[in-house]
């Protein structure tokens, strides 16, 4: 290659030479190395090209030290009927920018396209008219699928792009989410490409504008194989199979899906199913708590069994981490080995090792069997219905803790009671420290039922601790005989619960008065006034819930097959669902239609109106997929002629379906 000559290789070697680069003269001594940089510049226009060149030069001049966007979140896409469910992790939210030296994450934005390069979404132009920014997905309500932190950053950034005259939109202080259901003009059978990009707010002091993580999907035009980045997805929406029953949480009774094994917390849980495909049948999960601060973990109680070959001083890394050491079993030749003697376990890392310092019965080359359970959710502190818990087994859990307080809604006279005293409940002296996490019953009698633990005043009632999960027991009371002072409780006087312990240890106070704006009805024997409290979770609380996997109603049911259809029908020349020819973009891609709402297992036979078999298609897929494409070719792979065709669906026990379809070319 000669200096100043850029259009010749100056070589006789033939080859597919796409790019030619040249350089001025420079010396290169024996053994010496010179580094060089190459910038490949493209642009929509000359202005766009020169601006890109300036940016490339700036990057070079700063030794490639430029603003780093947040980490890419991991995206999962779940196809549905005219919708797509997306969910992602929160790794981007702890991204550190080495230039600004701060955690500058700001939000998430979703892009959708039928083109893997997303070029049809690069619609936002700069002042030069060049397409520069990508337009976010529009939600069904008309807004952008864009969510950002609630902080001082919102709207257009204060730092415009150099030479572009436009700024990145930082969002509208919506708050963050980690899942989204796209149902805005989602067409079954159409392949969509999604990307979730994380972005930061930039640094005004340094003049660095917002940065957005890349979105890269590579498609091999010869094989149509798709290569996805971690924050992208390719999905085809579809109807579920006929008879499909979506996976869900099991209910222990008609009211609750969760079972309170132990403890006395009154907080609540809810479960959102995001990916029914990932739910395992009859899988039981256990929720446990730790205190100071309150946090909870969820254990998958279905044991995982792995077989490995032992080698001393070599760590065995299991499929899962954050193991429950109490349920960990390691067997060698059918004998259970002892932790700490035969092997060492590192539960949080999910690793086990046999070291030569142990007096172990496990020798090199022994085949060992390992059984364990693990925590898919570990020490979450999200206790206010936050939606940012990680998704596991296709579900996300929401927890709502309660502060210790009186539950005024449930504190009332029990059904069947005739008394209507107005009873005001609160901690003694109004001190929060005198509240206790318990439920009580004030049980009335027609005669003396209890005596004050301080003094000798009597009362025609008893106070019992009836907290769910405890054996009910009677509490000690102190009658505040200050109104009549006749050594007995009188209407208008108060009662205080005396707790166990050294000294005078009091808790709740009950002020019992005549009813306001009502005729007095005295309490009689058998009347009960119930006192309920809201109680926070603590380390005594254990809950369990169980999931049911998706299933198929496989018994014969004529109605299940009635909804089977062909899309489009009639087929007229083309179909918007047909893919492009990636090798020859100007040519049309392969023709296609699809059968919809099929059983997950069935045989499709297509005939001419004279009864000649055209094609047999065997449909065997997952429960959530009732879709099967046909490329409008015969069994010999020839294009079919236009006309009317008969299709027959054989679904075995579920029955049969016959229909017609029209092809107009």
Give the role of each language-model region.
Residues 610-640, 651-655:
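Glycine-centered tight-turn motifs at strand-turn-strand junctions
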Residues 201-249:
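Extracellular fibronectin type III
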Residues 87, 555-603:
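Glycine-centered coil/turn sites that cap beta-strands in beta-rich domains
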Residues 642-665:
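C-terminal tail/sorting-segment detector
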Residues 294-376:
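Extended beta-strand solenoid/passenger and fiber regions
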Residues 82-102, 595:
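Conserved aromatic anchor
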Residues 182-203:
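Beta-strand-rich modules
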Residues 1-62, 499, 511-517:
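Beta-strand-rich recognition/accessory modules
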């Amino acid at each position: 290659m000669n200096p100043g000559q850029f259009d010749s290789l100056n070589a006789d070697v033939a080859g597919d030479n796409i790019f030619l680069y040249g350089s001025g003269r420079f010396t290169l001594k024996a053994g010496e190395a010179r580094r060089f940089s190459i910038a490949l510049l493209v642009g929509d226009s000359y202005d766009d090209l020169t601006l890109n060149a300036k940016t490339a030069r700036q990057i070079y001049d700063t030794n490639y030290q430029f603003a780093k966007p947040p980490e890419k979140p991991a995206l999962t896409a779940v196809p549905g009927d005219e919708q797509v469910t997306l969910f992602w992790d929160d790794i981007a939210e702890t991204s550190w920018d080495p230039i600004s030296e701060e955690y500058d994450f700001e939000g998430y934005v979703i892009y959708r396209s039928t083109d893997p390069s997303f070029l049809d979404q690069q619609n936002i132009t700069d002042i030069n008219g060049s397409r520069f920014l990508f337009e976010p997905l529009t939600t069904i309500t008309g807004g952008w699928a864009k969510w950002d932190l609630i902080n001082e950053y919102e709207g257009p950034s204060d730092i415009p792009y150099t030479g572009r005259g436009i700024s990145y939109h930082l969002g509208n202080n919506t708050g963050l989410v980690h899942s989204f259901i796209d149902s805005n003009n989602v067409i079954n059978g159409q392949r969509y490409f999604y990307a979730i990009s994380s972005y930061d707010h930039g640094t005004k002091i340094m003049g660095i504008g917002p940065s957005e993580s890349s979105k890269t999907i590579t498609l091999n035009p010869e094989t149509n194989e798709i290569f996805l980045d971690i924050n992208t997805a390719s999905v085809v929406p579809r109807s579920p199979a006929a008879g499909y029953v979506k996976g869900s949480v099991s209910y222990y009774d008609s009211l609750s899906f969760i079972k309170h094994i132990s403890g006395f917390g009154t907080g609540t849980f809810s479960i959102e199913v995001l990916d029914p495909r990932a739910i395992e049948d009859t899988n039981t999960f256990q929720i446990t708590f730790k205190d100071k601060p309150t946090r909870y973990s969820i254990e998958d109680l279905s044991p995982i069994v792995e077989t490995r070959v032992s080698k001393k001083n070599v760590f065995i890394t299991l499929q899962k981490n954050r193991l429950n050491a109490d349920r960990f079993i390691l067997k060698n030749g059918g004998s259970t080995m002892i932790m700490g003697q035969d092997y060492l376990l590192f539960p949080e890392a999910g690793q086990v090792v046999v070291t030569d310092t142990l007096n172990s019965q496990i020798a090199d080359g022994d085949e060992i069997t390992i059984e364990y359970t693990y925590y898919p959710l570990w020490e979450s502190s999200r206790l206010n219905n936050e939606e940012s818990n990680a998704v596991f087994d296709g579900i996300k859990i929401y927890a709502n803790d309660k502060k210790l307080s009186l539950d005024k809604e449930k504190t009332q006279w029990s059904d069947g009671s005739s008394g209507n005293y107005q009873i005001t409940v609160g901690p003694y002296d109004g001190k929060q420290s005198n509240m206790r996490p318990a439920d009580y019953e004030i049980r009335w009698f027609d005669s003396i039922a209890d005596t004050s633990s301080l003094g000798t005043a009597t009362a025609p009632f008893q106070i019992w601790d009836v907290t769910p999960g405890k054996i009910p027991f009677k509490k000690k009371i102190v009658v505040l005989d200050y109104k009549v002072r006749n050594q007995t409780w009188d209407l208008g006087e108060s009662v205080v619960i005396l707790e166990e312990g050294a000294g005078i240890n009091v808790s709740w106070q009950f002020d019992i008065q005549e009813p306001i704006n009502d005729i007095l009805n005295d309490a009689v024997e058998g009347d009960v006034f119930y006192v309920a409290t809201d109680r926070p979770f603590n380390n005594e609380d254990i809950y369990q819930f169980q999931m049911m996997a998706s299933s198929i109603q496989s018994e014969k049911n004529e109605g299940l097959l009635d909804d089977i259809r062909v899309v489009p029908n009639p087929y007229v020349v083309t179909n918007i669902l047909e893919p492009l020819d990636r090798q020859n973009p100007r040519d049309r891609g392969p023709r296609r239609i699809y059968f919809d709402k099929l059983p997950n297992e069935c045989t499709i036979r297509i005939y001419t109106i004279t009864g000649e078999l055209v094609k047999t298609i065997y449909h065997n897929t997952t429960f959530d997929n009732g879709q099967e494409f046909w490329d409008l070719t015969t069994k010999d792979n020839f294009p079919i002629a236009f006309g009317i065709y008969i299709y027959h669906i054989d679904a075995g026990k579920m029955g049969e379906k016959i229909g017609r379809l029209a092809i107009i070319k």
